[in-house]
Amino acid sequence: MKRIITLVLALILALTLCACVTPKTPMPIEDGDKFAAQPVTVRLGGLKGPTSMGMVKLFDDADNGLGQNAYTYTIAASANELTPQLVQGELDVLAVPANVAAILYNQTEGGVVLLAAGTLGVLYIVEKGGETVTDIASLNGKTIYATGKGATPEYALTYLLSQHGLTLGEDVQVEWKSEPTEIVALMAEQDNAVAMLPQPFVTVAQSQVEGLRVALDMSAEWDALDNGSRLVTSVLVARKAFADEHPAALAAFLEDYAASTDYANEYPAEATVLVEKYGIVKAAVAEKALPQCNLVCITGVDMKVAVGGYLQTLYDLKTEAVGGAMPGDGFYWMGA
């Protein structure tokens, strides 16, 4: 009996010693743990104008490693240069005209989502050589230089004209140009001219074209109609696949973007230095233009109301303006 007890105790002691031995080979790390600490890189796209002016602090913070995410960014003169990159998965977030966001949503069958409204109205009618333009009705019989065919500028102008009994292409002609700088050069050469320009290019034109005046604020004209919608110039969209995979990173981006927009509005002198640094416009121009750029970061329910009302107005005017159908609820990203 004593022998049996001794053998049992010896066996227990041996098992205990084996359990306490540290294995020489470390335990494998699960793939999820290995990548959990890796920062998400958000690839951004913006335009040379108010959309990127609101993001310059975010760009600068990213360059200095201060953002909540890692960011890369591309700034272009036209949305047409960047929308293919978003669709092809080369960009994750892009600033585009509001109606283009709806078109992309329809064309990709829900492949993009709306994150925020980034700028409200930044469009103005400017006139050189007279004071003949006093209201929308006074545009009758005139030819206007403009950019933005097939986007917010064209549809905003079409809608405002229609509300005053005028038809674009019949009562009012437009010569569409690819970039605002072309229009500024044309107006400098002519004695009398009318154009529709966005900020900050209105300020650029005023610095280069003698006798140029701001005749109409298109946002004020829109608001005067009291139709329940707002003139939303640009918005931020993201690939739905990215939003589904990285909702927390997207929410962090919106926090960084809101802070960047606030910085531009609250510290214009400092922000304009960054606007020039990132090649958008010169600081002196940006300083005058910023207060008229209506930089915002409207998200959630407020975004849905503001952008949805604007898109409905465009849809009622011309269904093709929003891609043939009003976007459904899935279009609006309501947060992580």
For each predicted feature, which ranges?
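Positively charged n-region of N-terminal signal peptides that target proteins for export
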Residues: 1-11
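Short, solvent-exposed loop/beta-turn-alpha elements that line the ligand-binding surface or hinge
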Residues: 62-69, 220-229, 295-304
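Solvent-exposed, polar/charged alpha-helical surfaces in well-ordered, non-transmembrane soluble domains
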Residues: 53-61, 80, 84, 88, ...
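Conserved C-terminal helix/tail region of periplasmic/extracytoplasmic solute-binding proteins
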Residues: 308-336
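Short, glycine-/small- and polar/acidic-enriched structural segments
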Residues: 25-167, 174-176, 193, 199, ...
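Pocket-lining segment of extracytoplasmic ligand-binding domains
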Residues: 99-100, 181-274
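C-terminal motif of bacterial Sec signal peptides marking the signal peptidase cleavage site
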Residues: 16-19
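Secondary-structure end/capping motifs
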Residues: 243-317
